[in-house]
Amino acid sequence: MSAFTLKISDGLVRRIEAHGVETFPYECCGALLGHDDDSGREVTELFALSNHRDDSPRNRFEITPEDVLLAERTAREKKMDLIGWYHSHPNAPARPSEFDREHAWPWYSYIIVSIRDGDPKEITSWRLQDDRSAYDPEGIESVAARTGI
């Protein structure tokens, strides 16, 4: 059992999968907005971003510093937290790569969706250890979608 759990609605999971299908065979990426408090960490909104990786978008993604600031500002304006990031792995497992680890930050949740031949197959979530040496798996708990946000 994972030490961490990320709550997210089935509808938001489907939207991450749809974003991965839409950009296939290239990686998609986006921000996870929500809340991290005593009741746990919950994604309540997605913020789709463009993959700015020009040299290898089929197996790499890049989120610009400007997009990070935009995601942070959007979260703040909506009285939410920026709690993580998502991206797809076209025709690859939903496991973080060494490249993912080298470019990730501790604390955040990282959702990865595997898209095989244009179809979503697996979705996982991870948290980078504080020393950045490895990821810990993060459980995904399905919750009802919030309304009125």
Regions found by a protein language model. Name each.
Residues 1-82, 90-149:
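Conserved beta-strand-loop surface patch within small alpha/beta domains used
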Residues 85:
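Conserved, mostly hydrophobic/aromatic
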